[in-house]
Curated annotation (Swiss-Prot):
Region (Disordered): 1-29
Keywords: Membrane, Transmembrane, Transmembrane helix
Localisation per UniProt entry: Membrane
Organism this protein belongs to: Arabidopsis thaliana
The name this protein goes by in its record: UPF0496 protein At3g19250
Length: 360
């Protein structure tokens, strides 16, 4: 395998800031075999952009190694997620289904991004590094006569590179569309569930206010009746008035719905932010697909012209011009993959924290 050139790190700009998330509810304590303090501390020990990048760039991006990298670097891991959900939600509900779906989609999308890194590595090692080696040898001055040996060398390199398949999927690829569609559908479901929960909270608020008014009215009626009704009749009035003035839904239901809204908001805003990241990555991959396609077209045209000392230098010249731009695009894509990892860890960790937050 040829030696591959490395990238210079770019400045990370996270797209998932704290302002995207709802204000947390008050902290409390919980008694459970599940260590809440330890889990929250571990969840927020998410690797930084530079940590992720430094670890990713040193591994051999085979499928097995990338899967191992995912299991080590994705926070929180599946075990923590399942324990948290089983602790807070004993029964399977719409909320738990949506939250579980968010965690699963974010993991699948992260695996997809790691596969893109594998494609970047393939393009670097099997296309752009051999071209760079050729550029370092081939004379830059196209006006002077080029030695036939250089043209033969370039032609042989073209023969080898012509067999290289474009590692980047076309913009019409189902894999990318399916990944994005999952997030779009999840966003719609979360939005619907949030509206439903908010509607329930408003209903509970009106019911509570109505029951308070009912209680005041009952007290007034009882006081007025006391002047005309014998003492032994008072318990009967209270027995009748009590059920009529009791809130239709207990206050704990309202707290539960508010807790649900907090969790749904974190999941919804995390979904929105990650979808934006996917859109950016999609555009980068699309440009790289076109760039590799055009480079391969130049290589094919060069081969069709044969070992000509006049045309081969022109094709090398054109490939040299596009080389800087395309290798820079590869670097930018790697930056966004590392940024994705940072953002998805932060988003998942914040949702886990909201799930484990005690209801007070």
């Amino acid at each position: 395998m040829p030696h591959c050139f490395t990238f210079k790190p770019a400045s990370p700009e996270g797209s998932l800031g704290d302002d995207h998330l709802p204000h947390p509810s008050p902290e409390g304590s919980v008694a459970s075999t599940f260590n809440l303090s330890h889990e929250l501390a571990h969840a927020f020990q998410t690797p930084s952009y530079h940590d992720i990048r430094s670890r990713l760039l040193v591994i051999d991006p085979t499928q097995e190694n990338l899967e191992l990298f995912l299991s080590q670097e994705l926070r929180p891991n599946n075990e923590s997620v399942q324990e948290a959900l089983s602790l807070r939600h004993a029964k399977q509900t719409t909320l738990t289904n949506l939250v579980s779906t968010y965690f699963q989609h974010s993991e699948d999308a992260t695996r997809f991004c790691l596969n893109l890194y594998q494609n970047v590595h393939s393009a670097r090692c099997h296309l752009y590094t051999p071209l760079l080696d050729l550029f370092n040898i081939f004379p830059r001055d196209s006006h002077s006569a080029i030695d036939e040996s250089f043209c033969n060398l370039a032609f042989d390199v073209f023969l080898k590179l012509d067999t290289f398949e474009n590692p980047f999927a076309s913009p019409e690829s189902h894999s990318f569309q399916d990944t994005q569609l999952c997030f779009y559908q999840l966003a719609d479901k979360l939005d619907t569930r949030i509206r439903k929960s908010k509607s329930r909270v408003r209903l509970l608020h009106h019911a509570t206010a109505g029951s308070a008014l009912c209680l005041v009215t009952a007290v007034v009626v009882v006081a007025a009746s006391a002047a005309f009704i014998a003492y032994h009749a008072l318990p009967t009035i209270l027995v009748v008035a009590g059920p009529l003035c009791t809130p239709y839904l207990p206050h704990s239901f309202k707290k539960k719905e508010l807790s649900n809204i907090f969790q749904l908001n974190v999941a919804a805003k995390g979904t929105f932010a990650l979808n934006k990241d996917l859109d950016t990555i999609d555009r980068l991959v699309s440009r790289l697909h076109t760039g590799v396609k055009n480079d391969k077209l130049l290589i094919r045209l060069g081969l069709e012209r044969g070992r000509d000392v006049y045309t081969i230098p022109e094709f090398v010249k054109q490939l040299r011009k596009s080389h800087v731009n395309h290798t820079h695009q590869l670097e930018v894509l790697v930056d966004h993959i590392c940024r994705w990892f940072t953002n998805v860890n932060k988003s998942r960790s914040l949702l886990l924290k909201e799930i484990l937050r005690p209801q007070t």
